[in-house]
């Protein structure tokens, strides 16, 4: 039992600060980054303290901040209002922050690009994925996967409930499961552009258009979209796009969990 002791890799200064479960993940954030600060710990609490003390010694705005994903950052807004609260200059899109890079970064526990002052350990990152076997065909079966980390008991692998066994519904439900099984600041990484855009770019427009698409058709999967939106309404949540079926370890694990759920 002693040989499987869990390690925590704290990155107090790097491309994306946070606490990582493997060295491969952490090293991507510090290799080639001038003035990096990182250390391995046997406990989450010690890694957390390192991030707080070492991270506070440096300006959060110094040095490059690069990531390969597209990040959609949420700040809390009132669920009773049809309008999203603002973060940037536009009425709606200031709730959405995007950052791009050609450099590949993988699974992270990071601060949102607009909230780097938050202690790195206060935000967790999970991967969510959905899978539908025979998607769009008769007899399709779908599953949802949420990956928290290697051997993490919180990892989720379940079949998709309901009659509609589509990939899009599985992707949305996976995000819902990630939200329902966490608390506090959260980053969800997904390879579903549909899910991310539904909850960010498109939802404000749909609300103004009586939940109709640009072609005046009813919005599909609105039950899941509204559920996810409600769960995000009182939390600081970021949705980050990662390329599916690539070398991203976290996405691979979430996909495996989703496929397993579809096979149950």
Curated annotation (Swiss-Prot):
Q: Where is the composition biased (Low complexity)?
A: 56-85
Q: Which residues carry this modification: Phosphoserine?
A: 97
Pfam families (UniProt xref): Cauli_VI, RNase_H
Identify the cofactor(s).
Mg(2+)
Record: residues binding Mg(2+) 1: 129, 171, 191
Which GO molecular function, any one, fits this protein according to its record? RNA-DNA hybrid ribonuclease activity
Q: What class of enzyme is it?
A: hydrolase
List UniProt keywords, sorted A-Z. Answer: Endonuclease, Hydrolase, Magnesium, Metal-binding, Nuclease, Phosphoprotein
Q: Which InterPro entries does the annotation name?
A: Ribosomal_bL9/RNase_H1_N, RNase_H, RNase_H1_euk, RNase_H1_N, RNase_H1_N_sf, RNaseH-like_sf, RNaseH_domain, RNaseH_sf
The note describing how and how many cofactors are bound reads: Binds 1 Mg(2+) ion per subunit. May bind a second metal ion at a regulatory site, or after substrate binding.
Residues holding Mg(2+) 2: 129, 255
Task: Please name the CDD domains in this protein's record.
Answer: RNase_HI_eukaryote_like
User: What Gene Ontology cellular component terms go with this record?
Assistant: chromatin; nucleolus; nucleus
Function description: Endonuclease that specifically degrades the RNA of RNA-DNA hybrids.
Q: Name it.
A: Ribonuclease H
From which organism does this entry originate? Schizosaccharomyces pombe (strain 972 / ATCC 24843)
List the taxonomic lineage.
Eukaryota, Fungi, Dikarya, Ascomycota, Taphrinomycotina
